[in-house]
């Protein structure tokens, strides 16, 4: 616990700048740092409706007014230990940080890029909107952060993601004018995160914003190059600095006359951008600041652009073909669990590919991915072993309620779920299992958490060690 209040850690230069920016609102802004933090979660609506989530969630939640699938939860709750979280039914996210993805109108079937995606806050939201159709490219330049990104995409059950670890410049060579929608949540000075991460407040310097502004201007131009005509680009930061906000927006408008700044949805507490904080372009008023003294959140900035021209949904379809051995053992497994659909969609054998005994389910939209550093192309289904197929944890999480017949569903209050998540074997009553033996999906309220193998009344735990709580 810090010995100092946040306001005591804030740089005088930061406070002076905020006073100049906010004028009469400055005192309210300063007092917001003394208020308790807000905690939020976002429901995975590709798996569960908000009404159903509210019915089964075992702790109190309150809707976030400006996010249709967002909820506040109390500070003393630990949602990550809840079986519903381990089933990928919700994601923990700071409330104002939910806003960028919610303001980018993604439609199933589109090609979507999250350029600086780790740890997956926005990518999981975009993937849920695509609902298994189209292509999500989730990229991060940091290898370690990209691994965290992959884990969250797998936890959310996203089947159509291409997770890359690339520089934006190299990515752009492979995807010129390829994406219908792009989200650029740029690396920033994090002024909207000071209450959450005190080190950011302690280490803040005026020079940091100027340095980051140069990077952000480079990134936003690279993003524009990858956006197809008629496509939308959402730029966001979690900072208040004009150098990283209005000035970056101005830079794009000055250098790309084919990009237009659009109006964002209005909500009480949204604050319009200030043209004078950029190059004076009157359209900067269409960008939006989220300040902590006006909303229940830490703070954010966002701007939505449209590229001139018309767009379409035409894309190259994936055309993999499983080898005979893969098809034989995978087909037997799918029959054993009674697979009806995968992620609510018919299983497509043309998307199955085997690489070194690992079986993948490719995104429905293909592309030229040669020469790119990637962690995952599509869904990792499992491994070919000697005379059998062994399913993966991402495969289990990609399945939705009703996708398979061989299930053991327990109520969210059942302590056996916690024991399963710790790697323990479970005792299962005959009436609780769909079949007398074999592979089953263990579910919470019908929503898959992971696989197990039933032998008599014992469910052998197949929850991987690296996923256990």
Residue ranges and their predicted role:
Residues 119-132:
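Conserved SAM-binding loop of SAM-dependent methyltransferases across substrates and taxa
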Residues 1-21, 25-54, 298-301, 308-469:
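Polybasic, low-complexity RNA-engagement segments
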Residues 144, 180-221, 238-245, 271, ...:
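Mobile active-site "lid"/loop adjacent to the S-adenosyl-L-methionine
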Residues 130-131, 227-229:
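Helix-to-beta-strand junctions that scaffold the AdoMet/dcAdoMet cofactor pocket
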Residues 139-177, 184:
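S-adenosyl-L-methionine
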């Amino acid at each position: 616990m810090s010995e100092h209040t946040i306001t005591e850690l804030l740089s005088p230069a930061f406070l002076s700048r905020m006073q100049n920016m906010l004028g009469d609102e400055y005192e309210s802004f300063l007092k917001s740092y003394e208020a308790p933090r807000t905690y939020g979660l976002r429901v995975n609506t590709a798996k569960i409706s908000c009404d159903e989530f509210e019915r089964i969630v075992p702790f109190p939640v309150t809707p976030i007014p400006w996010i249709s699938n967002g909820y506040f939860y109390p500070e003393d709750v630990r949602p990550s230990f809840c079986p519903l979280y381990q089933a990928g039914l919700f994601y923990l996210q700071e409330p104002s940080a939910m806003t960028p993805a919610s303001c980018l109108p993604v439609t199933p079937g589109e090609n979507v890029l999250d350029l600086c995606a780790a740890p997956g806050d926005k990518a999981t939201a975009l993937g849920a909107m695509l609902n298994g159709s189209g292509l999500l490219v989730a990229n991060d330049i940091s290898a370690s952060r990209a691994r965290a990104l992959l884990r969250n995409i797998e936890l959310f059950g996203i089947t159509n993601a291409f997770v890359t670890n690339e520089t934006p410049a190299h990515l752009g060579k492979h995807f010129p004018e390829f994406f219908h929608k792009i989200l650029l949540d740029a690396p920033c000075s994090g002024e909207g995160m000071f209450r959450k991460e005190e080190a950011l407040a302690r280490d803040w310097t005026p020079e940091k914003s100027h340095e980051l502004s140069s990077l952000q201007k480079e990134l936003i131009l690279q993003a524009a190059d990858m956006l197809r005509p008629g496509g939308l680009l959402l730029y966001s930061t979690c900072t208040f600095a004009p150098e990283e906000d209005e000035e970056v927006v101005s830079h794009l408008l000055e250098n790309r006359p084919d990009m237009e700044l659009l109006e964002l949805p209005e909500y009480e507490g949204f604050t319009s951008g200030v043209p004078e904080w950029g190059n004076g372009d009157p359209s900067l008023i269409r960008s939006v600041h989220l300040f902590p003294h006006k909303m229940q959140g830490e703070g954010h900035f966002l701007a939505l652009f449209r590229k001139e021209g018309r767009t379409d949904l035409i894309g190259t379809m994936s055309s993999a073909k499983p080898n005979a051995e893969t098809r034989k053992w995978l087909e037997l497994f799918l029959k054993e669990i009674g697979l009806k659909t995968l992620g609510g969609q018919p299983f497509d054998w043309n998307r199955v590919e085997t690489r070194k005994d690992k079986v993948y389910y490719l995104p429905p939209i293909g592309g030229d991915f040669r020469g790119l550093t990637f962690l995952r192309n599509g869904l990792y289904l499992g491994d070919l072993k000697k005379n059998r197929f062994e399913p993966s944890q991402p495969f289990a999480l990609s399945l939705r309620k009703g996708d398979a017949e061989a299930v053991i569903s327990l109520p969210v209050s059942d302590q056996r779920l916690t024991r399963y998540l710790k790697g323990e074997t479970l005792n299962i009553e005959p009436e609780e299992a769909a079949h007398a033996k074999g592979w089953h999906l263990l579910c919470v309220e019908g929503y898959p958490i992971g696989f197990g193998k039933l032998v008599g009344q014992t469910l052998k735990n197949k929850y991987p060690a690296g996923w256990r709580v």
